[in-house]
């Protein structure tokens, strides 16, 4: 159900547009079909390996690896959230996971001899894709997210990949500036929008060609399904991504797609509470002497704040900081009562982890990535401060 173009400016305030459509209204109605008497508002999942197809094969639904009506509803919904004002009609392609979505963009648009520019401080699995690209004969260049450092590597590039805010360091780059420079150099631009979600940042409006995300995290927000998606500026780009999905079979199950669509209805409510919780937590952590390296784009003193405030509509649910050493960090995590020691982020239940336990990220042993959930703010902040007090006692 297309419900108009949005020019609102805040998840927290439920930003709207010229016809009065706010983020919450859009999220609740996104992707719904026109009402049909005696049918549910959101049709249930369609489980089908093949579809009845007499005669010539016409229409989108032929075989379950190609298309599914449950995907269609979800894809339309995400496109409405990612690019409500896109005049040419953005298209979304959903995948079995975020890594499947990332791989689809990179591997469908880069071939031997091409140049791809990646961040060197992005998601932990991105180096695996770098290795695969290089094995295929693609030249990969890397630079940090901060300071728009990737600008210096665009000569001859085929594709520029941005991750902003970066995970787990929370650096931010100027998407519009980088996109303009990349397009001038003849490169396509993809932005990993996982941390911001479509309500916090709209990469296509900032000039990107692709907005890519793991829907496992903030988009669906319950920590109970894996999903990825790519929203493309136009049909031609989407066709290449969709073809790659068909080739490798990286499709979401109908149940996962349906659960994801159902979860979108609460996206604005979840995002607003979680973003507010993250900022309150960051402000409380700023007063703690044992905390160093505190990062959250919403803090006025954060190095990324000025850039983030110019392109983000809210600042996300993640806070990162460093405690004195590994033992101190582990004591802190063990002392928390309202926060699960778990990886990933974006869920309604707060999680935190010592990120260095995985290896691969250039972080200190005491580095904590904290994902603020939807708990009452005073309860969450009190639990974290109590945990810090216990950890400090040794």
Explain the meaning of each model-derived region:
Residues 2, 86, 130, 140-141, ...:
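PLP-dependent enzyme catalytic core of the Aspartate aminotransferase-like
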Residues 2-9, 16-70, 74-77, 371:
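N-terminal "arm"/small-domain region of PLP-dependent enzymes with the aminotransferase-like
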Residues 27-42, 327-360, 366:
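C-terminal core of ALDH-fold dehydrogenases
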Residues 29, 81, 86-290, 295:
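Conserved PLP-enzyme active-site core in the AAT-like
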Residues 50-51, 232-237, 264, 322-327:
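Short loop segments at secondary-structure junctions
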Residues 248-249, 336-346, 387-394:
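A common structural junction motif
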Residues 262-269, 316-324, 368-373:
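Short, well-ordered beta-strand elements within core beta-sheets of diverse protein domains
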Residues 279-337, 354-363:
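Conserved small-domain helix->loop->beta segment predominantly found in fold-type I
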